């Protein structure tokens, strides 16, 4: 939120809104989505990526994964686009719609479709750059495979993540979760 005190730029607002939405705080992320929609009605990334991602995350928080998937339909033609905002190979927004669509599809128990969304992220590493969704897609892909009953592919996805994060601090929550989930396989 401190970033919003310094700037009301489109990308700063989206980054703050995304952090809030991923933290399941739609009471604060949705006013940001409203503001982006109001101030940037013709902006391609605001209209077709940023706002739909924030709205879909809110739908997920509300337990409405199908609504989340529907809200992201508008983003499909733009999901491989790059905003032009690059922080040392961190492209803000690139494939966020695919990641959130994958989460929504998992919640809707559409596991094969969810796996395809997470695989899309892994297949386009150049767009994702060092965005955390690049690593997290491995975990989510593993989860999709577990839920669809394919333990062999799940093990591979989890191992890919654990290899990427082999030097990470050992108490990071997603890492401990991934290790525990992998151990159950």
Where are the language model's segments positioned?
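"A position-specific structural signal for the A-helix of alpha-solenoid helical repeats
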Residues: 15, 19, 49-50, 54, ...
């Amino acid at each position: 939120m401190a970033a919003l005190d310094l700037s009301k730029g489109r990308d700063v607002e989206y980054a703050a809104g995304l952090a809030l939405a991923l933290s399941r705080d739609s009471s604060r992320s949705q006013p940001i989505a409203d503001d982006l929609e109001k101030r940037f009605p013709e902006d391609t990334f605001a209209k077709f990526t940023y706002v739909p991602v924030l709205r879909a995350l809110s739908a997920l928080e509300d337990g409405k994964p199908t609504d989340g998937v529907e809200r992201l339909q508008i983003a499909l033609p733009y999901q491989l686009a790059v905003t032009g905002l690059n922080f040392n190979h961190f492209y803000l927004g690139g494939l966020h719609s695919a990641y959130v669509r994958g989460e929504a599809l998992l919640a809707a128990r559409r596991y094969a479709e969810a796996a395809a969304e997470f695989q899309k992220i892994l297949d386009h590493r150049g767009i994702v750059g060092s965005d955390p969704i690049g690593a997290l897609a491995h975990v989510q892909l593993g989860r999709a495979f577990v839920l669809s009953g394919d333990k062999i592919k799940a093990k591979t996805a989890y191992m890919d993540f654990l290899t990427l994060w082999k030097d990470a601090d050992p108490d990071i929550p997603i890492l401990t979760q991934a290790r525990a989930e992998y151990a159950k396989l």
